[in-house]
Design a protein with these regions (language model features):
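Short, conserved beta-turn/loop elements at beta-strand boundaries and strand-helix junctions
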Residues: 5-9, 70-77, 118
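Canonical phosphoinositide-binding patch of PH/PH-like domains
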Residues: 90-91
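Long, well-ordered amphipathic alpha-helical subdomains in the mid-to-C-terminal portions
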Residues: 60-63, 67-69, 73-80
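Conserved hydrophobic positions within beta-strands
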Residues: 2-3, 67
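Glycine/charge-rich catalytic "coupling/switch" loops of P-loop NTPases
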Residues: 9-66, 87, 97-126
Length: 126
């Protein structure tokens, strides 16, 4: 994603979805040198969900994705998703109705987003 800054708010642009980063994670100024640059963005599958409560709580981090595979794994479902040509994986509740071929909205817990320098692969968020 491309890192942007509006005022004191850092935003990562994920192919058109502008995701604001939590200010407490960006307050140290370490990201200033990366504004306008493309960074690697990482998030664990358990921090991407499709349920209404999670979508409401994380209303600034929605992505419109397509379900490629829905795999029931006992107490949870793994959703293999595509978003703008990128592969994502979400670990969702077994009550999820998302199935292969569905176009769904997922949200990310922005407190759990990781940014990496694409050259050094060092993490950039505290």
């Amino acid at each position: 994603g491309v890192l942007k800054k509006e005022g004191d708010q850092f935003i990562v642009d994920l192919a058109g979805a502008n995701i604001p980063l939590p200010k407490e994670k960006t307050a140290d100024g370490a990201l200033d040198a990366y504004v306008g640059k493309t960074l690697k963005v990482g998030i664990r599958p358990e921090d991407i969900k499709d349920d209404e409560e999670f979508l409401e709580k994380h209303s600034t981090s929605h992505l419109n994705a397509e379900v490629e595979v829905s795999e029931l794994m006992g107490a949870e479902i793994y959703l293999y998703l595509t978003y703008q040509g990128q592969n994502l994986m979400a670990r969702v509740a077994p009550t999820s109705k998302s199935r292969r071929g569905d176009k769904i909205v997922v949200a990310m817990d922005t407190n759990k987003i990781h940014l990496f320098d694409p050259e050094t692969e060092l993490t950039l968020l505290n």
